[in-house]
Curated annotation (Swiss-Prot):
UniProt-annotated binding residues for Mg(2+) 2: 175
Residues given in the record as ATP binding sites: 41-43, 100-101
Reaction catalysed by this enzyme: D-ribose 5-phosphate + ATP = 5-phospho-alpha-D-ribose 1-diphosphate + AMP + H(+)
One MF annotation (Gene Ontology) recorded for this entry: magnesium ion binding
Function: Involved in the biosynthesis of the central metabolite phospho-alpha-D-ribosyl-1-pyrophosphate (PRPP) via the transfer of pyrophosphoryl group from ATP to 1-hydroxyl of ribose-5-phosphate (Rib-5-P).
Active-site annotation: 198
Protein name: Ribose-phosphate pyrophosphokinase
Quaternary organization: Homohexamer.
């Protein structure tokens, strides 16, 4: 797939090696030879077992459970590649951790999303490739280029293929903050939108206040960037059914699915939950209601474009 004067290398940490291998396979290269383990005291140990001098290097490491271990692996590997004289280092981070801590919601709180950006840059990244940041303005926390991919085209294409007649569809934003994403999704389906007005009295707890829009007799599709404990999405689905929606599905980019999420989804009125695999969804999380779509093709195409110095934004124009 790639034919260029520079030498490309793809490496991965331990957070999601199967995704890195899928991306590398599409590009037509092998994942680089490295070992990431632990010293006896729990510190992260990294060995890079091949030369990377002068290469265009892409380190694929999503930031998922155990989150802080994933972060330390990323930072230490970036440092190793920088000290080994890699020509250009792109940190490929499908899911960017601490993205919800992007501002001071109350006094004396940290802005950890900014701290993360500083750490990644200082460790050695020359560029970042990520997908659906919880707050897009996090791109401005970096002093290096950030290529920000969107999950909406992949998710919308799935629902278009599943619904030959989109006349009875309505796309629903689970909160005011997600309206822009929901509108993009709805435009692809040529469907109207509705908005759920909710309040969040404390973290991971939400209450539906009202629904803006007519969902009666419609097939509703809830669109979010992330499903964590699934409280918000399940509350929204229950409210939509109560308001007369004949069917409710949900989709998101990042399936964190922590704590009671799986049990809540199982017991919810949701017909289907479509999730992109920016985070591994394995074992007990692979319930019948959950449909997982791969992000490997879009990341492979973005890596190809970065490597060949082509515009990444054209990916979305070609969708």
């Amino acid at each position: 797939m790639i034919n260029h004067g520079k030498n490309i290398k793809i490496f991965t940490g331990n957070s999601y090696p199967s995704l890195a291998e899928e991306i590398a396979d599409i590009i037509g290269v092998q994942v680089g030879d490295s070992r990431v383990g632990k010293f006896s005291n729990g510190e992260t140990a990294v060995d890079i077992n091949e030369t990377v001098r002068g290469t265009d290097l892409f380190l694929i490491q999503t930031l998922c459970e155990p989150v802080n271990d994933s972060i330390m692996e990323l930072l230490i590997m970036l440092d190793a590649f920088k000290r080994a004289s890699a020509g250009r280092i792109t940190a490929v981070i499908p899911n960017y951790a601490y993205a919800r801590q992007d501002r001071k919601a109350k006094a004396r709180q940290p802005i950890t999303a900014k701290l993360m950006a500083d750490l990644i840059h200082t460790a050695g990244a020359d560029r970042v490739l990520t997908m659906d940041l919880h707050a897009p303005q996090i791109q401005g926390f970096f002093d290096i280029p950030v290529d920000h991919l969107e999950g909406v085209p992949i998710l919308a294409k799935y629902f278009i293929n599943q619904n030959s007649n989109t006349d009875d569809l309505i796309v629903v934003s689970p909160d005011i903050g997600g309206v822009k994403r929901t509108r993009k999704f709805a435009e692809k389906l040529h469907a109207p939108i509705a908005i759920i007005d909710k309040r969040r009295p404390k973290p991971n707890v939400s209450e539906v206040m009202s629904i803006i829009g007519d969902v009666k007799g419609k097939k509703a599709i809830l669109v979010d960037d992330m499903i964590d404990t699934a409280g918000s999405i399940v509350n929204a689905a229950e409210a939509l059914v109560k308001m007369g929606a004949k069917e409710v599905s949900a989709c998101c980019t990042h399936g964190v699915l922590s704590g009671p999420a799986i049990e809540r989804l199982e017991n919810s009125p949701l017909k289907e939950v479509v999730i992109l695999n920016t985070i591994p969804i394995e074992g007990d999380k692979r319930i019948d209601k959950i449909k997982v779509l791969s992000v490997a093709p879009i990341f492979a195409e973005a890596i190809r474009r970065i490597y060949e110095d082509m515009p990444v934004s054209k990916i979305f124009q070609e969708e």
